[in-house]
Amino acid sequence: MKTVIIGGIAGGLSAASQIKRQAPDSEVVVLEKCGDVSYAACGMPYNLFYRDRPVEELYALSLETIRTGRGIDYRLRHEAVAIDAARQEVTVIDRQEEREYRESYDYLVYATGNRPNKLTQPGFDDTAVVYFKTLDDTRRLKSLIYEKAPRSALLVGAGYTNLEVADVLFNMKVRPVIVEKAPTILPAFSPEIREKVLEKIAEKGIEFHSGVDVLAKEGAVVRTSAGAFDADLAVVAIGVKPNTTLFAAAGGELGVAGAVKVDRYLRTSLPNLFAAGDCAEHYVRQLGRNGYMPLGPVANKQGRLVGSNIVNNGTMTMFAGIDQTAAFKFFDLTVATTGLNERQLQEAGAEYLKIFIDSPTRGAFTGGGTMRVLLLFVKGSGLLLGAQMIGQDVVAKRLDVLATAIYKQMTVFELAELDLSYAPPYAPVWDPLLVAANLAIKKA
């Protein structure tokens, strides 16, 4: 059995590793068009802060481990340029040798990830503009920061990525200015969570403008509908789109958000072709249908399952799905979410109740901070639909308790009965989750 995998970062390498683990004698070829092996892209903003720490420290595995230790034929700078689904062949260009060849397969895994949305306005193709997506982007941004010593940076887009970048730049004494086209930041979060992020932006003295159209970049000045801003460099992070050009050209069917349409086994519309990661749809358990939420853990889970399903083709396993759990850091705040959000519930016409509480994270005399817990739930039954949190100290791991509760379809009544650990260094005697659950019970 021979499997060819297009894309070797997250889902692709996970699929390759699982195939070799379960079927060591099978042939696995990974075609990765860039020069980097699988890496932790979510760590890129934090690497910026350390001039002497190479971006290669974000590699998940060394090339030697992948090739020798796992027995995977992992080819860097080999770009797949066409898929012939009928002949089960991939046309490849070796960018190092500049030669074209064809690679046959029994199974093909499409794991090409996503690509950044780009600005088409004049000036946003110059060298002082970074679309922060890959390790090469990180290398270039570090070079601009440490060699050009910029005093100001314009961040276009106010999502997770640029909020993390703003945090890092601020602490490097580079003045960030954030502009966002939408009316506000973080539209997937409830207003009660967004307001705490906006308070932190104001507290740090960071200039922020929403509802802004970017018009042009002229040298070190960016013109917008809100005026002109000095920008020694610009970081653009305005969302991503699934990288599906090659798949679509082969006649493959696309689905939600233009991602590769997959079934619950992660099979595509083309024969013997699976898809995983940021290029593919993701089954959302609570909605009972596919959605699109490109995150590293999801890509790795899908890749692992694809590898297993290829080996066990007669007894495949369904992808369990996602509950849209995510978290990010912004200065001393952790912002986290799981389950359905208000926008999704309103679009579905669903009735729901909402509560939020503010609570200390642990015993006051042990330090700690404060956190806000927000719950979305069904009146009467108390079924937990979604949860969001923001605050200092232990936030993300508490959010994981709520992610587990949503996975198990727990109610706020059951949540209030959980036997959570207590000691002053870790929690107040009434954990914030229990306080929130008890308030929800009063409304349910």
Language model features: what each stretch is:
Residues 1-73, 160, 166-189:
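Beta1-alpha1 glycine-rich phosphate/pyrophosphate-binding loop at the start
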Residues 6, 103-113, 156, 229-239, ...:
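Short hydrophobic core segments
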Residues 6-10, 14, 18-25, 33-34, ...:
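Flexible, glycine-rich terminal cap/loop adjacent to redox cofactors
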Residues 25-27, 69-96, 103, 171-262:
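A Rossmann-like FAD-binding core segment of flavoenzymes
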Residues 59, 152-154, 160-215, 295-298, ...:
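Rossmann-like dinucleotide-binding cores of NAD(P)H-dependent redox enzymes
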Residues 110-172, 207, 262-264:
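Glycine-rich dinucleotide-binding loop and its adjacent helix/turn
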Residues 125-147, 221-223, 228-308, 401, ...:
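FAD-site-proximal beta/loop scaffold in flavoenzymes
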Residues 262, 276-340, 426-443:
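A conserved FAD-binding loop/helix module that cradles the flavin
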